[in-house]
């Protein structure tokens, strides 16, 4: 049976699984869907066309599914879709998408979103991502799986942060961070491969060595970006265990619209 505190407001039309728990003074809007075993903390607001999957935990005073902070927004029925097993802590704000993009903000599975984080409209957050307290994502930001964003960091709109990368605390990021790379500073600069993170996630020594070689080609050998990309493509077909990782590294760089940190 759904456990809804008597002071909570669940508007008609909301689809709430019978195992959901909703705390005191929380508000759930009419276009919200909440999956099994999800917990909504006290004073939280879940609104808009928002879908929450299973086993999510929403902290006190979180604002999930609010209108985009975009002056072009004209109350179109855009969406927020959140997957399973996410922890979203106190005072976090996550906004729906805009029609100027694809109309949906997405958050995958198993993410750890700490207090006071902001995830702007049209952001795409992958799986197993950690967003530390007060990290701020502007609109249209993309974050790959297993990325870690340090506290008090600001990420410019349309920036892409690659899988398994790490952004240090209090950083200002205005260009893309390739996968597997550590970045930090204001403005953020590259500081090597995220070796410890890759070891923890089961990357082989050979794969890590190949990524270190890729990093040196891109950042340490004095090559232009185009020159580095030629050599990176050769490294990606070297026949070793790191080929797939280096290929992902090169493909991310090729797809960059804002340019990568250098």
Curated annotation (Swiss-Prot):
Function per UniProt: Involved in the biosynthesis of lipid A, a phosphorylated glycolipid that anchors the lipopolysaccharide to the outer membrane of the cell.
Keyword annotations of the record: Acyltransferase, Cytoplasm, Lipid A biosynthesis, Lipid biosynthesis, Lipid metabolism, Repeat, Transferase
Enzyme class: transferase
Protein family according to the UniProt entry: Belongs to the transferase hexapeptide repeat family. LpxA subfamily.
Quaternary structure annotation from Swiss-Prot or TrEMBL: Homotrimer.
One Gene Ontology MF term: acyl-[acyl-carrier-protein]-UDP-N-acetylglucosamine O-acyltransferase activity
Primary location group: cytoplasm
InterPro entries: Acetyltransf_C, Acetyltransf_C_sf, Hexapep, Lipid_A_LpxA, Trimer_LpxA-like_sf
UniProt protein name: Acyl-[acyl-carrier-protein]--UDP-N-acetylglucosamine O-acyltransferase
Annotated source species: Burkholderia ambifaria (strain ATCC BAA-244 / DSM 16087 / CCUG 44356 / LMG 19182 / AMMD) (Burkholderia cepacia (strain AMMD))
Catalytic activity: a (3R)-hydroxyacyl-[ACP] + UDP-N-acetyl-alpha-D-glucosamine = a UDP-3-O-[(3R)-3-hydroxyacyl]-N-acetyl-alpha-D-glucosamine + holo-[ACP]
């Amino acid at each position: 049976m759904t456990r809804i505190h008597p002071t909570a407001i669940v508007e008609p039309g909301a689809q709430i699984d019978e195992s959901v728990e909703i705390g005191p003074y929380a508000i759930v809007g009419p276009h919200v869907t909440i999956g099994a075993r999800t917990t909504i903390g006290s004073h939280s607001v879940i609104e808009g066309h928002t879908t929450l999957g299973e086993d999510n935990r929403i902290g006190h005073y979180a604002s999930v599914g609010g209108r985009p902070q975009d002056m072009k927004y004209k109350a179109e029925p855009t969406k927020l879709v959140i997957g399973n097993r996410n922890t979203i802590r106190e005072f976090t704000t996550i906004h729906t998408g805009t029609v100027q993009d694809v109309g949906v903000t997405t958050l995958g599975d198993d993410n750890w979103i700490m207090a006071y984080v902001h995830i702007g409209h049209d952001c795409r957050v992958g799986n197993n991502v950690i967003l530390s307290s007060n990290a701020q994502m502007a609109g249209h930001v993309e974050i790959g799986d297993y990325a870690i964003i340090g506290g008090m960091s600001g990420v410019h709109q349309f920036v892409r942060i690659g899988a398994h990368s790490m952004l240090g605390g209090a950083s200002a990021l205005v260009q893309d961070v390739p996968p597997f790379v550590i970045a930090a500073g204001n403005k953020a600069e590259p500081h090597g491969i995220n070796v410890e993170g890759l070891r923890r996630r089961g990357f082989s020594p050979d794969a890590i060595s190949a990524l270190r070689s890729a990093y040196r080609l891109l950042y340490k050998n004095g090559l232009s970006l185009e020159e580095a990309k030629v050599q990176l493509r050769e490294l990606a077909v070297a026949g070793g265990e790191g080929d797939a990782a280096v290929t992902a590294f090169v493909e991310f760089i090729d797809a960059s619209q804002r340019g990568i940190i250098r």
